[in-house]
Each structure stands twice: as structure tokens, then as C-alpha cells.
Design a protein with these regions (language model features):
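Phosphate-backbone binding interfaces of nucleic-acid-interacting proteins
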Residues: 1-196
Length: 196
């Protein structure tokens, strides 16, 4: 998943694409863009300056799509089509939820349709039989944080159960405390696109 961030005012009309967590070792920059390349010469970030001249973009965070890829190819001569419409935010169902002794944390087994993930969660409202939004490994939150495999108190965690705040959702469509609680109109395994 590519993290796509844009705000005409606060980011000085610059589109920021976070392609990977690799550190750039080479930079290619001109008046239109700045590209970062990792040790394997793969693009790890792209910044496009004066982005508003390529269209009307009113969101701050969005899913990488064909339109953005065409702009990238035109401006930077880089093809990122393999990332188009990859969404690492999916609907999951908590099948098991056990408290981790002496902590506020829970170890959850979450069905995301094609697999069951172990996820450690600190939300008070985490419980068995709840449908939730799962940020899988590789997801990038609107804050820019990339979700990686982690370990808490020796317990491996393969994703994150998300709150509306963490996803930048402020429209009161979802509960504002704890992780998002979804009803059955959101099928398990389907993409969650409410923040794009």
C-alpha cells in the first residue's frame, strides 16, 4: 500500500507518497518532483510539487489509484501500477478475545476473510463477536504510521484494530471511543474505504 498525503495549504501544495519504509540513499529532484531511492534502487518516496495543477484534490489522505499513477508516470516517469487500489484496511471479525493478565491489553484472533490474524489490542471495547476495521501489515494510517508486524509482551501481533480517530474519520458515522464497531452491512474480508 502507498500512503498518499496531500493538503494544499499545510503541505505547500505537495503530494507526498510513502511507497516503503526503506531509507533513501539517493535523491532525484527538480522543480516538479523529488524521488527517493533505496539501496536496491527502488522508489521509496515521491513528492510532487504544485500538485493542484494536475487536478482538483480535496482530500488529505486517499487510496493510490489509476489517476494518481498516470500523474506519477507523466511527471516522474515512474510506474507504480502494481500498487493501484491496494487497500490494507479490511473488515474483520473478532472470533476470540482474551485479556492479557496484568494489562489493559487483549489478544484477539481476527478473521479477515482469507486468514485469521493474531492482533494485540488495547481498546476497552475489544470483545468476541465484534466486527472491526483491521489495518493489515503494510497499511499506512492517515498519520503516516505504517503498520508492521510487532510484538507486545512477547505476543506477536499482525495488524491493528482501528478507531475512527486513528483513521481520521470525524463524521460521527462510527463510535468515537475505542475501536470502530461495525454492523453486518460491512462483510468480513471486504475493503474498508470510509476514510478515502
Amino acid at each position: 500500500m502507498i500512503g498518499c498525503f496531500y493538503n494544499k495549504n499545510s503541505l505547500n501544495d505537495t503530494l507526498i507518497l510513502n511507497v516503503s519504509n526503506e531509507k533513501p540513499i539517493k535523491i532525484d529532484q527538480n522543480n516538479n518532483y523529488c524521488l527517493g531511492f533505496d539501496k536496491n534502487n527502488d522508489v521509496c518516496f515521491i513528492n510532487i510539487f504544485n500538485f493542484s495543477k494536475y487536478g482538483n484534490f480535496d482530500k488529505n489522505y486517499f487510496l493510490f489509484n489509476d489517476q494518481l499513477n498516470k500523474i506519477i508516470m507523466n511527471v516522474c516517469k515512474v510506474d507504480l501500477s502494481k500498487y493501484v487500489n491496494i487497500n490494507n484496511f479490511v473488515i474483520g471479525h473478532i472470533g476470540e478475545c482474551e485479556e492479557i493478565s496484568g494489562t489493559h491489553l487483549h489478544k484477539c484472533k481476527v478473521n479477515i476473510g482469507n486468514q485469521i490474524l493474531d492482533i494485540v489490542c488495547g481498546a476497552e471495547n475489544a470483545r468476541k463477536d465484534l466486527n472491526v476495521v483491521v489495518a493489515t501489515i503494510g497499511a499506512i494510517l492517515p498519520s503516516g504510521k505504517r503498520i508492521n508486524k510487532g510484538k507486545l509482551l512477547g505476543i506477536e501481533s499482525f495488524g491493528m484494530l482501528c478507531s475512527a480517530k486513528e483513521l481520521g474519520i470525524t463524521n460521527k458515522k462510527f463510535n468515537d471511543q475505542g475501536i470502530i464497531e461495525l454492523n453486518s452491512i460491512y462483510p468480513v474480508g471486504s475493503s474498508f474505504n470510509e476514510m478515502f
